[in-house]
Amino acid sequence: MRITELLTKDTIAMDLSSSDKNGVIDELVHQLDKAGKLSDVPSFKEAIHNRESQSTTGIGEGIAIPHAKVSAVKSPAIAFGKSKAGVDYQSLDMQPAHLFFMIAAPEGGAQTHLDALAKLSGILMDENVREKLINASSPEEVLQIIDAADDEATKEEEAEANENSTVSTDNSNQDN
């Protein structure tokens, strides 16, 4: 799965105006709804808030990844928003969040939201990617940055898989 299968131009908000966590959630939910991804906005918003009440999705390094898997979602999607000023998102590192990725998955969506969460987290560990996203000036640029980082992550996963299969082949030869 590629992030840009779920993140599209119509789910990107380049300049969030909210100054608090609830406002950011409202803006990102609106972005998903405007793109036709939600069938029940209040239910989806409630699911996001319920998830946030369990523990913050402000993971630190200026990133928040609110997410919910609920029947109010028509099709899996990711909304992206950024705030140059930063928002107190009650992040784990107590720093303001600047980059927001809201993952919306339908209730029967299998592993989609977990796969997206894992892949996004991996991509966003790269400080260079975060910096490029903060400075991006258009939805197209955001998609290019994510796509390039996704390509890089895929190459690294493939190289690691090849390395592991070589190691296991080497180990099995030692038994003979």
What role is predicted for each listed range?
Residues 1-176:
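Cytosolic covalent-transfer regions centered on His/Cys nucleophiles
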